[in-house]
């Protein structure tokens, strides 16, 4: 069972003050069946193109969280039901999107955490453009590959180190 993000914040106030632990801006909504998730970050930077998102989710997730910096675009969705199912089937703990998702009923049926800014019915482009395994700027914090992501109904936390057993 995952420790609630609020409890992690309370237990690590010194690391919050130093910046070793950061709280993302409270702009993300939970769309997946699993509201709480945690794992090391795998990162992507894309813009209105989810080709690399699919490529990453086709790989074994090994308990990681895919962090997608979609530039905050609200003009199309970067993750939908098919990609959430792919994430679930391949062992990803969660997907955190600085952008939109779609197929919200399908997302709610997938046993994977999905947090995003909003829902949008339009699909994205498929040009396979973007960068992977780089630091990404998410609302409220910069995230490096391998940093720990903790998400639940109360928010999203980023840590340089694992905060739980």
UniProtKB/Swiss-Prot annotation:
MF term (GO), any: oxaloacetate decarboxylase activity
First-level EC class: lyase
Catalytic activity as recorded in UniProt: 4-hydroxy-4-methyl-2-oxoglutarate = 2 pyruvate; oxaloacetate + H(+) = pyruvate + CO2
InterPro entries xref list: RraA (IPR010203), RraA/RraA-like (IPR005493), RraA/RraA-like_sf (IPR036704)
Cofactor note: Divalent metal cation.
Leader peptide range in chain numbering: none
Family statement drawn from the similarity comment of this UniProt entry: Belongs to the class II aldolase/RraA-like family.
Residues given in the record as substrate binding sites: 80-83, 102
Required cofactor(s): a divalent metal cation
Organism in which the protein naturally occurs: Ralstonia nicotianae (strain ATCC BAA-1114 / GMI1000)
Subunit structure comment from the entry: Homotrimer.
Positions bound to a divalent metal cation: 103
EC number: 4.1.3.17, 4.1.1.112
Keywords from the UniProt entry: Lyase, Metal-binding
Single biological process term from Gene Ontology: regulation of RNA metabolic process
Function: Catalyzes the aldol cleavage of 4-hydroxy-4-methyl-2-oxoglutarate (HMG) into 2 molecules of pyruvate. Also contains a secondary oxaloacetate (OAA) decarboxylase activity due to the common pyruvate enolate transition state formed following C-C bond cleavage in the retro-aldol and decarboxylation reactions.
The protein's name: Putative 4-hydroxy-4-methyl-2-oxoglutarate aldolase
């Amino acid at each position: 069972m995952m420790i609630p993000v609020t409890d992690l914040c309370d237990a690590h106030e010194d690391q919050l003050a130093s910046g070793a632990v950061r709280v993302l801006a409270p702009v993300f909504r939970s769309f997946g069946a699993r509201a709480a998730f945690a794992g090391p970050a795998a990162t992507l930077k894309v813009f209105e193109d989810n080709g690399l998102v699919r490529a990453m989710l086709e790989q074994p997730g090994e308990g990681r969280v895919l962090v997608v910096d979609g530039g905050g675009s609200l003009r199309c969705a970067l993750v939908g039901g098919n990609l959430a199912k792919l994430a679930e089937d391949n062992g990803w703990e969660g997907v955190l999107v600085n952008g939109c998702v779609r197929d919200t009923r399908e997302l709610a049926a997938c046993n994977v955490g999905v947090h995003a800014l909003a829902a949008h019915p339009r699909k994205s482009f498929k040009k396979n453009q973007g960068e992977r395994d780089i630091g990404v700027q998410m609302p409220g914090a910069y995230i490096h590959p391998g940093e720990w992501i903790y998400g639940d109904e109360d928010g999203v936390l980023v840590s340089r180190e694992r905060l739980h057993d």
